[in-house]
Amino acid sequence: MKRKLLAATLTAAMVLSLAACGGSSSSSSSGTAASCSGASGSGELQVNIWDNNQLAGLQQIADEWTEESGVKVKINVVDWDNYWTLLEAGASGGQMPDVFWMHSNTAQMYMENDLLLNLDDYIAKDDAIDLANYYEGVVELYNRDDNGSQYALPKDHDTIALLYNKAIFDKYGVEYPTDDWTWEDVRDAAAKITEAGKADGVYGYAINTSNNQDGWYNIIYDYGGQVITDDHKGTTIGSDEAKAGMEMLRQILEVAAPQTVVAETGTDSLFNSGLTAMITQGSWMINTFYKAEHHDDYAWAMLPYADVNGNGQCDKGERYSAYNGLGWAAAANTADPDAAYSLISYFCSEKAQKEQAALGVTMAGMKGVSEDFANAFEGMDVSAFTRAEEEGDLFFRPYTRNTTVWEDALQQNGGFLDAWLNPSDPAVMAKACDNAQKIIEDAIAAE
């Protein structure tokens, strides 16, 4: 009975936003149900991930561990949606992979249902792992609320930046974005390009409003609002501050690619096709644009800021970037828990974390070892991502015990859907913020 209830619970929790740290654009469909088989009987650890861009680098690191341990590692890439479907199937009575990525949307559910290996005893005996050396938000995320135990170690963290196409700016005579830009500057530049590019079908800006982490969450925090409060028990999304941020977003949406166009094509495809001049994206997607045909035309800037103080400069608290972090977790029923933890420990060791950054896989989950990440993409300056945490402010991607309940509701009728599709009316956006306040409060109360 518990497993049937678990299956239903996880099914509800698996409708995940593609915005969340490594969505579908960079994933592969090479995974199958067979890839979920564990070490039992195979003599090797089965590892599941969802981002094909990271496969080569992570397999290289895993092979180094194999040389030390003698245990083989097979990393399987499963596309984002099937990843969670297969993991759910394993959790509900099948066989889960030995080691796999865990995510903020589902972590508490998997931990509370005893599906993940408790790492406390291993960490206590492991001289290579000191949780104080990792980003606090990522550590906290994979710490179970009701018993304080740790069920995953931080794999990485990420930040958000503004990506722009220099060729489009040149064509329409608009100056390039800089780190001094405000959101008003983005709006004004987008308006100029969208107007000038009408005959060519080119837009100045594109945002997928279903993508929150690399999209509209950031502007709310810039203006002083919070999607979820720091204690994970409330929200200020209906406050005057949050409404000011969403009003600025509304003004940008008025001059950006319509959501009907974005829904059909996607922001990344629009950008790589030369049909939009600006998007915001996460550090986990750099490789996609670095390998694109016209990557020489691409450049990154820090996210714009909100000049709330009106003094013409970016003060503390006016430029935020969301950050998130995946966790390396092991199945509670893995046939070889010692080997599974040993691999996780190696992935999260200082040596491997530095290597991960230097290879351009992702920014490290360990603090202070991502210096080489900014130099991993020859010819493309990606320092905007590391400078986001050095010169700006970070907030951890908002989550509660059952994040997907309110995240999904915010995208529907009664949430922000009407505001996304009809950005010309300020009252619609303001009302959506009020609705969102109640949606989130009600969802938290029901958790």
Provide a role label for each language-model segment.
Residues M1-L45, E67, D434, K438-E447:
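Short, low-complexity disordered leader/linker segments with a strong preference
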Residues A33-C36, G41-N52, V71-N76, D98-V99, ...:
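Short, well-ordered beta-strand elements
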Residues A34-G38, N105-T159, A299-A301, F377-E378:
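Hinge/lid segment of periplasmic solute-binding proteins
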Residues I61-Y134, D170-E175, L270, A277-M278, ...:
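Extracytoplasmic "Venus flytrap"/periplasmic binding protein-like
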Residues G90, P97-D98, A128-I168, C314-S321, ...:
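A structural signal for short loop-to-beta-strand junctions that line the ligand-binding cleft
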Residues A358-Q411, G415:
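Long, aromatic- and glycine/proline-rich binding clefts that accommodate carbohydrate-like moieties
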